[in-house]
Each structure stands twice: as structure tokens, then as C-alpha cells.
Amino acid sequence: MFGEGVGGDAAFTVEVESGVLGVIVDVLGHGEEANKLAVRMQEYLLRQTSGDVVGLLSRLHEGFRSSRGAAVGLCMIELASGRMRYAGVGNTVIRRFGDSETRLVSRDGVVGGTMRTPVEETLQLSDGDMVVLYTDGVKTHFVAAEYPWLRTHSPCVVATNIVHRFGKPHDDASCLVMRYKR
């Protein structure tokens, strides 16, 4: 983002009891204060061991009630079964790219502010599916045809390319990509 040295986005994974938890955070606002809150939320979530996405969002909301708040998306992938569970609040996006494309919906609200009860959505992943989480700093409606190597590049390369190709110049932009392998 132009004019800011740091931002309020965070994207990371956490190993939990039965798989991997993918996390995307977009703190309201920009700059140093937004960055500090994003780091605190990341530190909190890195200490968690549960893959219960609804419970984690609810606890995060309670723990950061007095903050400026954030949009947060949590994606739990059970490694043995390929079952994916997602819950999100605010302007976070999760998409699955595989034989077909699927987009799951985050609920309106702000973690730490006004938030309705999160809702969990589930998907069954197939071998090689790419799960892509991103913040509202990335153009929402890009299609796989705009990035034909989406399923063949490494997740790190895909995330970097999505931010560079589809990121908005005047907003923080973060992307997390995970490939499911049986």
C-alpha cells in the first residue's frame, strides 16, 4: 500500500489437533496501530490447538472487544479426510480452485466490534485442490482463467502473484494459499 511502511493484515497457518488452520486477518485502518493489533491477534491464534473455527472466532471476538476490530477468516483442513471447515467475519474471502471453483461466504461484522454468531461452512477437498484466502485488498472477482497456472505453481508463488496481479494499490492486501495433498 502506498504511504505506509506496515499494514494491518496477517496471513498464516497453525498446526492444530487434526490438521492445519489457515488464518487471514484484516484489521480496520492502516499503519502502525493496525499492525500492532494484527500481531496481537496472530500471537493469540498461534497459541491455539483447536480446529473449531466457530469457537475460535467467538473467543477471538471476546478477547479483542476493546480493540479497533478486524475482519477474520479461519479455514481448518483435516489432513486425513480432506474435510475443510470455514468461518469468517467481515471482508475476507475464501475460494477453492480444483475441478470446480467454490466461494464460501463470510458473515457481516467486525471481530472485536459488532459480530453476529459465526456460521461454519464445510467442503470436501480433492487431491491437488488449492484453497485461497485473501483480504479485501485483493480484487474479489478474479477468475482462474486470469491466472492459468493457479493449480500448478507452488502455494507461495500463487499467493505472491495474486497480490501482485489483483491487489488494490491503496489498501493492505494479503493472501494465503494452501494446496491439499492426500
Show which residues each predicted segment covers.
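Conserved subregion of the PPM/PP2C metallophosphatase catalytic domain
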Residues: 1-34, 38-182
